[in-house]
Curated annotation (Swiss-Prot):
Primary gene name: ldh2
Pathway(s) where this gene product acts: Fermentation; pyruvate fermentation to lactate; (S)-lactate from pyruvate: step 1/1
Origin: domain of life: Bacteria
Its job: Catalyzes the conversion of lactate to pyruvate (Potential). Contributes to S.aureus growth during nitrosative stress in both aerobically and anaerobically cultured cells, despite playing a secondary role in this resistance mechanism.
Protein name: L-lactate dehydrogenase 2
Highest classification ranks of the organism: Bacteria, Bacillati, Bacillota, Bacilli, Bacillales
Length: 319
């Protein structure tokens, strides 16, 4: 690979993409930030708008409109482009149309001579990330999905509101599909080493509160989409967090979507959200959380759904 730097190319300047661009500029994560979209006038306007704010960025960043040839020397290509999720539509129902869009985008990126890392956010993210890995032949650690980073943040936030602590003080994870079969790992969720599940049960006298928090976490996107059309701030910040871990070589453990290789019950090939060490070499090490028998069964179900869905679009791997 080429020498590692901090050039990021964003493909997709919709609500998620533009929110991500704003987050990256305000955090000063990239040195060079290129935006690609078929809506060239919007890109031009967003670039102008963002550059006007770079004086307030914590470090210099050059924002520009670009084309696919700009991917040649990019360190990180982030793809948010795709058909949006409609009210009532599941992420998996998006699969065929967004896989076709993704294939076209990735072919153009690879044709540029790109030799960096992919970060995928378009839905269904686990399926599309696996598709990119298999279509390009890149090592799994260099093809990363946003996974359940956002879902885990939602869970942490809801728990924090119930327990009266800061979200950052909550150690809790959503793993599996970024979607309807995701699961909360209650057996490991804690605040200062104290079980969240047990605390909720003690406070309420029942197990219903934990289930309510899980359901509200799982279904948050549907509620937001129904009210305002799409989700973008939360996922944009999650993407910024992953990008920062890569570009700054932070060695952070994040629940990104990555390919399993025998972990969590011997599963191989499937991409889904699990705790993974992320640094300038990509998603380099999966951490295998101890799961209860019930949690393992739910995880296996998530794997099965994702495997079956991927099988339905495998034909698109052929040129």
């Amino acid at each position: 690979m080429k020498t590692f730097g901090k050039k990021v190319v964003l493909i997709g300047d919709g609500s998620v993409g533009s929110s991500y661009a704003f987050a990256m500029v305000t955090q000063g994560v990239a040195d060079e930030f290129v935006i690609i979209d078929i809506a060239k006038d919007k890109v031009k306007a967003d670039v102008q708008d963002l550059n006007h704010g770079t004086v307030h960025s914590p470090s210099p960043v050059d924002v520009k409109a670009g084309e696919y040839e700009d991917c040649k020397d990019a360190d990180l290509v982030v793809i948010t482009a795709g058909a949006p999720q409609k009210p009532g539509e599941t992420r998996l129902q998006l699969v065929e149309k967004n896989t076709k869009i993704m294939k076209s985008i990735v072919k153009s990126v690879m044709d540029s001579g790109f030799d960096g890392y992919f970060l995928i956010a378009a839905n269904p993210v686990d399926i599309l990330t696996r598709f990119v890995k298999e279509y390009t032949g890149l090592p799994a650690e260099r093809v990363i999905g946003s996974g359940t980073v956002l879902d885990s943040a939602r869970l942490q936030y809801l728990i924090s509101q119930e327990l009266g602590v800061a979200p950052s003080s909550v150690d809790a994870s959503i793993i599996g599909e970024h979607g309807d079969t995701e699961l909360a790992v209650w057996s490991q969720a804690n605040v200062a080493g104290i079980s969240v599940y047990d605390t909720l049960k003690e406070q309420t006298g029942s197990e219903a509160k934990a289930e309510e928090i899980y359901v509200n976490t799982r279904d948050a996107a549907y509620e937001i989409i129904q009210a305002k059309g799409s989700t973008y701030y939360g996922i944009a910040l999650a993407l910024m967090r992953i990008s920062k871990a890569i570009l700054n070589n932070e060695n952070n453990v994040l629940n990104v979507s990555i390919q399993l290789d025998g972990q969590y019950g011997g599963h191989k090939g499937v991409y889904l959200g699990v705790p993974t060490l992320v640094n300038q070499h990509g998603a380099v090490k999966i951490y295998e959380m101890p799961l209860s028998a019930e949690e393992q069964a739910l995880f296996d179900k998530s794997v099965k759904i994702l495997e079956d869905t991927f099988d339905s679009i495998k034909y698109l791997l052929e040129d």
